[in-house]
């Protein structure tokens, strides 16, 4: 790494050769956090959201959400969020390109959410995590492949979707195309 940095034409990169064991950019969350892939296939009905502990270093191919709030996990794991990504987010080939700036920061969340409604979303989000734990032998990409998604995970996401949709409307949306 030292030689690589010394061979650069960029003065800041050359300076970093003094500490070859350090990352160029070190912005790590101080608490546990969530991650979302930068690029996801368009075949998925949901974007897989992962939890990382604060001592884990995420790949540059992941978007870091500096929160471990299960309510936020529920919102991000919902079909409503996937529809938002389809409308607002970027595209990459046949899939989605997730951007914290475009997809996460602009996702509309109702201002007034009752305690009961928030608890319901959290409960359903925990149901998604529990359903994922039942299939620990599967990679997350396979869990969210429509052809392989376990029935329990699909059901847990459907229940979460209903809870999230109730935050926005008294009736459930019939057509949620991303």
Locations of regions flagged by a protein language model:
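S-adenosyl-L-methionine
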Residues: 1-178
């Amino acid at each position: 790494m030292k030689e690589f940095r010394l061979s650069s034409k960029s003065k800041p990169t050359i300076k970093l050769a003094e500490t070859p064991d350090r990352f160029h950019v070190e912005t790590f969350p101080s608490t546990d956090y969530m991650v979302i892939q930068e690029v996801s296939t368009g075949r998925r009905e949901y974007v897989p959201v992962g939890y990382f502990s604060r001592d884990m270093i995420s790949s540059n191919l992941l978007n870091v959400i500096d929160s471990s709030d299960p309510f936020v996990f529920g919102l991000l794991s919902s079909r409503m969020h996937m529809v938002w990504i389809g409308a607002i987010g970027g595209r990459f080939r046949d899939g989605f390109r997730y951007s914290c700036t475009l997809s996460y920061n602009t996702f509309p969340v109702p201002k007034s959410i009752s305690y009961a409604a928030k608890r319901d979303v959290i409960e359903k989000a925990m149901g998604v995590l529990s359903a994922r734990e039942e299939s620990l032998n599967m990679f997350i990409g396979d869990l969210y492949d429509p052809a392989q998604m376990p029935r329990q995970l699909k059901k847990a996401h459907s229940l979460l979707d209903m809870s999230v949709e109730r935050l926005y409307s008294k009736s459930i949306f019939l057509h949620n195309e991303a």
